[in-house]
Each structure stands twice: as structure tokens, then as C-alpha cells.
């Protein structure tokens, strides 16, 4: 914190607001839970009171709102419903990583959760993530109120689609 600054912060981008949250709750022996600690919820609640109703929110965080379990079912992370109730009324885009796979979940017309495949591939071991996505990142633009995005692989141009090996 002394070197990098706070782990929870926000800034305006035009009328919209980017909120950066720490949603990893560390326990003992390197164990952690994915979710929102009480102080994180309090931060967002205090911030939301200051925002114009017309502001769209972009919440950048490590873990997505939904966690994929080993049996391939999904469950929301700890206190996700509390956070969703705080930001209710704003168009909200959650942008996360953590899983090294691409996954989009649309909760409603106003809430989208985008989990982006990692720029490091599968933990720096390969050029691909575990779902086959090449390592890369997303680029977001907003023009005339319309949000658009595309994925940009690290070693290819933005129009790159796939490679087939036979």
C-alpha cells in the first residue's frame, strides 16, 4: 500500500466511473475467499451516494462475480448480492481475470460480468489460456454513449481469430 497506493479506489472517466476493488479476502496459510469484505462494501456504498444517476460504472476486480466450481456449476462470490444491490440503478460492467478463461455473464440488461482470459496465458507456462484463448487483453471504447470492446491477442493483430493444426 505504501508503494502502490490503496487497493480500493475510483475515478471519473467523463460522466462514467471506474471503480477498482480488492475482492480477494485473505485468511491464514495462504488461503483466500473470493468476495467483498465489509470495508469494500462500505467504500462502494459511500461512493455511490456521490454519483450522478446517469453514471455508468466499470468495476475492475481480480475475481469475477461468479465462481466456477470443479463440478462446472457456478455460484456467486461472497457478498456479491450486497454489492449488486448497492450499484442497482446504474449500468454496471464488471471486468475481472483470475480464472485464466474467457467468460461473460449477463445478469440483466444493466449488469454484465466479463472475465477476461489472462495476458500471461496459463500461468506463464503456455501462449494460451486453459480454454484455448491466446494470451491477451480487451480494449474498451465508448462513443456517443455506446460501449464496445474487442479482444487483442498479444502476438497478433485485433482481427486474429484462430489457428488450426492438422
What residue ranges belong to the model's regions?
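Short, well-ordered beta-to-alpha junction loops that form the rim of enzyme active sites
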Residues: 23, 60-64, 98-99, 152-153
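Flexible, glycine-rich phosphate/dinucleotide-binding loops
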Residues: 27, 66-67, 122, 146, ...
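A short C-terminal boundary segment appended to hydrolase-like catalytic domains
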Residues: 138-166
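Short, well-ordered alpha-helical microsegments
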Residues: 66, 102-103
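A short, hydrophobic/aromatic-rich structural module that often spans a beta strand
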Residues: 67-76, 113, 160-165
Amino acid at each position: 500500500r505504501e508503494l502502490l497506493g490503496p487497493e480500493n479506489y475510483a475515478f471519473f472517466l467523463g460522466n462514467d466511473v471506474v471503480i477498482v476493488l480488492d475482492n480477494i479476502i485473505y485468511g491464514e496459510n495462504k488461503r483466500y475467499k473470493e468476495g467483498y469484505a465489509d470495508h469494500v462494501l462500505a467504500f462502494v456504498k459511500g461512493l455511490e451516494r456521490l454519483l450522478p444517476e446517469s453514471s455508468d460504472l466499470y468495476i475492475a476486480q481480480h475475481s469475477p462475480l461468479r465462481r466456477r466450481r470443479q463440478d462446472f456449476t457456478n455460484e456467486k462470490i461472497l457478498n456479491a448480492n450486497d454489492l449488486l444491490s448497492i450499484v442497482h440503478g446504474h449500468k454496471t460492467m464488471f471486468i475481472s481475470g483470475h480464472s485464466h478463461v474467457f467468460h461473460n455473464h449477463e445478469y440483466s440488461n444493466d449488469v454484465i460480468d466479463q472475465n477476461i482470459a489472462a495476458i500471461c496465458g496459463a500461468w506463464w507456462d503456455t501462449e494460451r489460456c486453459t480454454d484455448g484463448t491466446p494470451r491477451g487483453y480487451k480494449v474498451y471504447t465508448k462513443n456517443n454513449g455506446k460501449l464496445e470492446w474487442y479482444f487483442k491477442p498479444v502476438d497478433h493483430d485485433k482481427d486474429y481469430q484462430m489457428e488450426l493444426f492438422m
